[in-house]
């Protein structure tokens, strides 16, 4: 699941929200 999210975030890394989400998920 995390890997799928990472891929999605990578595809939408343009969005700042995605970046913030990844940070929260990593925490």
From Swiss-Prot:
Its EC number is 1.16.1.7. Homodimer. It catalyses: 2 a Fe(II)-siderophore + NAD(+) + H(+) = 2 a Fe(III)-siderophore + NADH. The keyword NAD applies. This is Ferric reductase B. GO terms for molecular function: ferric-chelate reductase (NADH) activity. Keywords: Electron transport, FAD, Flavoprotein, NAD, NADP, Oxidoreductase, Transport. It is an enzyme of class 1 (oxidoreductase). Its cofactor is FAD. Binds 1 FAD per subunit. Reductase activity that acts on Fe(3+)-chelates and uses both NADH and NADPH as electron donors. May play a role in iron uptake. Induction: By Fe(3+) ion deprivation.
């Amino acid at each position: 699941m995390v890997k799928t999210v990472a891929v999605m975030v990578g595809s939408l890394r343009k969005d700042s929200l995605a970046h913030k989400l990844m940070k929260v998920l990593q925490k």
